[in-house]
């Protein structure tokens, strides 16, 4: 049973606040030196631990630098496919794929992959067809914040026109249609686009989403834990805690959940804070930013509730060790 809030703060926060302060100092110092070399500003640091109820940190990049065009641009391509997972009718679907600068279809390099799910009322174009977001991804890679990565933006709607979805069936579409199509077309770390290949490459695959896409990420956790080690739910609560805990107890595979949310103007703020405090106090989870020592972290910002803030959260996730 989760600890009461005041006990939780006494037990968790007091033990870790000094290490977090040291981490922030190191981050600021390292980025200060890096900024002098590259000519762009040190990220703005926000410590919202008092609002989150757990130690947290959030860094905002220099938008003037990151959101301007990059001289090493990646590309965004469209993929079309049919799904047969929803009754007798076949549905036509579209997803978008970000490929990093230098991706060569005839090359041999392999890349980690992120599957990103949009929020309600948005679609697969929302993130990747936004120029500032693509520029930011390009700069994250060119500056070394992130290793070159592939990002895939599908949709959980099987009928986008009528906003129809089925979370019971969508995990099958993800495992049997989306993932095999993407990873047989583009060179991820899956050397074979089958269950064996996906399990062997799970450390290089992440499931991510914003708002309703975050809820999709939580819903996929029990069904994707064997083939993905990283889950990044942004500004969206969990619907089925019992299924998640059961999956954690059943699996012996390590995992890391990097949860993020905006501030008081983010409509998911209160629910995400409550969830973060509950999970951080649960014995199934070890709270903190170290992927070697922990399996859950909460990045709290002062952003509004908007899909495009996902690029800021991914920036923080990369700084905190995603795919490193």
Tell where the protein language model's regions lie, with residue ranges:
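Bacterial N-terminal signal peptides
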Residues: 21-29
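Positively charged n-region of N-terminal signal peptides that target proteins for export
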Residues: 7-21
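Sec-dependent signal peptide cleavage junction
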Residues: 28-37
